[in-house]
């Protein structure tokens, strides 16, 4: 992971976004590792949705298309169907989340990752994803709108 972290402060909250990752509009981060994409909830998404009580990625070997459910995450606020930001085959899941789902909140970009997928189409995988700066701007607009409610 890079040492460059972009930060966004809104009201009493501080959100962090590593600049070496890509982000979907739904708040899922992607780390490209060769032909594999590791994914998880962004710091903004995990803080916004509350403490994670349960996290279950699809099984290894499952094929998912971009936008299809790749994991289910239950928080104290809401049950989330996590859409895959890339299409591919699940090659690894974070088994630690079965025992310690709070890792999603404690270390969203490290030990709290959800799944790794073997990418089916590398060129298409990056389409529609945002850089950290682009996602920070989107998160800022969403967070400020929520504070005003």
Predicted segments, located by residue:
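Acidic, low-complexity mobile loops and tails
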Residues: 2-66, 111-121, 129-133, 137-149
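Short, conserved beta-turn/loop elements at beta-strand boundaries and strand-helix junctions
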Residues: 32-35, 93-99, 124
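Short glycine-rich, polar/acidic loop-and-turn segments at beta strand-coil junctions
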Residues: 43-45, 77, 86, 125
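Short, conserved secondary-structure segments in the cores of folded domains
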Residues: 53-54, 60, 78-81, 105
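Short, well-structured beta-strand-loop connectors
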Residues: 59-73, 84, 89-92
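Short, charged beta-turn/beta-strand-edge "cap" motif at the junction between a beta-strand
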Residues: 69-71, 76-78, 96-97, 121
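Mid-chain, well-packed structural core segment of small domains
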Residues: 80-111
């Amino acid at each position: 992971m890079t040492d460059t972290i972009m930060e966004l402060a809104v009201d009493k909250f501080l959100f962090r976004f590593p600049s070496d990752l890509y982000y979907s509009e739904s708040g899922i981060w992607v780390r490209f590792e060769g032909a594999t994409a590791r994914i998880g909830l962004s710091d903004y998404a995990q803080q916004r949705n509350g403490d994670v009580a349960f996290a279950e990625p699809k099984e290894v070997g499952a094929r998912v298309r971009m936008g299809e459910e790749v994991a289910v995450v239950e928080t104290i606020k809401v049950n989330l169907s996590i859409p895959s930001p890339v299409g591919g085959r699940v090659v690894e899941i974070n088994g630690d989340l079965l025992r310690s789902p709070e890792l999603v909140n404690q270390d969203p970009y490290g030990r709290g990752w959800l799944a790794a997928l073997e990418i089916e189409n590398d060129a298409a995988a990056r389409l529609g994803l945002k850089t950290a700066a682009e996602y920070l701007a989107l998160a800022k607009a969403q967070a400020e709108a929520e504070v005003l409610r």
